[in-house]
Regions:
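Structured-RNA-binding interfaces characteristic of tRNA pseudouridine synthases
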Residues: 1-255, 263-270
Length: 270
């Protein structure tokens, strides 16, 4: 079948969804998008994503690709995203849809991803961020947290910070190129960037860093926890609702990609 391939950038509020994937129980974001495509293009059966976000996790830069039968595509390319959004719920939006090379694959061509995690560090929660940030009311030592964050940069086995799932690859080794902590008012933003991530890895890292800031995990022990490859000795898993898949990187350099696309504001500067 002669098809046209499109690269999609998708944003969604993950609160109401059981993650990205189509689910046997509950609803995945993928299911809603495929249903929208099905109403417009009966020949489209599936979209392929760059990532699989977990239940309650959000996205501003999920990338996917889709192949549309050429015979069914009767609109200007620029109208595709608008047309899809007309069939999507308000908590899912296609930000862009552009033609992609025939060989492009959203997952296998990705060179890295950036996640951001938001914490509201004040005794009173900001009600506007209730579903977007983890409320942690205890005072935190940011200097120790930043020092600990630097220890994650580089190539490591991240087994100590990840959950387990049957689809995980045999290797737990990943390379992080960035692990920063920014502060804007009462909001803390963790920026974690790397070539790939294990299941719940970002949330395990953030939970551990918060416990370092709280004084429950000594800074001196973080390197030992990383080397232990034992989830039981690391910190807690941060809640899902503070995590956002911010960006997926492809062939161009990560810095130029990040500069070329501005993201919607999410309650504070990163």
């Amino acid at each position: 079948m002669d098809t046209l391939k499109f690269k999609l950038v998708i944003a969604y509020d993950g609160t109401a969804y059981q993650g990205w994937q189509v689910q046997k129980i509950g609803t995945g974001v993928q299911e809603k998008i495929e249903a929208a495509f099905g109403r417009m293009f009966p020949g489209v059966k599936r979209i392929h994503s760059s990532s699989r976000t977990d239940t309650g996790v959000h996205a501003l830069g999920m990338v996917a690709h889709v192949e549309i039968p050429r015979a069914e595509f009767k609109m200007p390319d620029a109208r595709l995203a608008l047309a899809l959004n007309a069939f999507l719920p308000d908590d899912i939006r296609v930000l862009s849809a552009v033609r992609a090379p025939k060989k492009f694959h959203a997952r296998f061509d990705a060179t890295g991803k950036q996640y951001r995690y938001y914490v509201w560090n004040h005794h009173a929660m900001n009600p506007l961020l209730q579903k977007r940030a983890w409320h942690f009311p205890v005072k935190l030592d940011l200097a120790k947290m930043r020092a600990a964050a630097k220890l994650f940069i580089g190539k490591h086995d991240f087994r100590s910070f990840a959950g387990t799932r049957s689809y995980e690859m045999a290797s737990n080794v990943r390379t992080l190129t960035r692990c920063d902590l920014k502060k804007s008012g009462e909001q803390l933003t963790f920026i974690i960037e790397g070539d790939g991530f294990l299941y719940k890895m970002c949330r395990g890292i953030v939970g551990t860093l918060v416990q370092v800031g709280q004084g429950k995990i000594p800074l001196a022990k973080v390197a030992d926890i990383l080397a232990s490859r034992d989830r039981r000795v690391a910190g807690m898993t941060a809640p899902a609702h503070g995590l956002v898949l911010w960006k997926v990187f492809y062939q161009r350099s990560q810095k130029s990609e990040a500069r070329s696309q501005k993201r919607p504001h999410t309650g504070g500067s990163a």
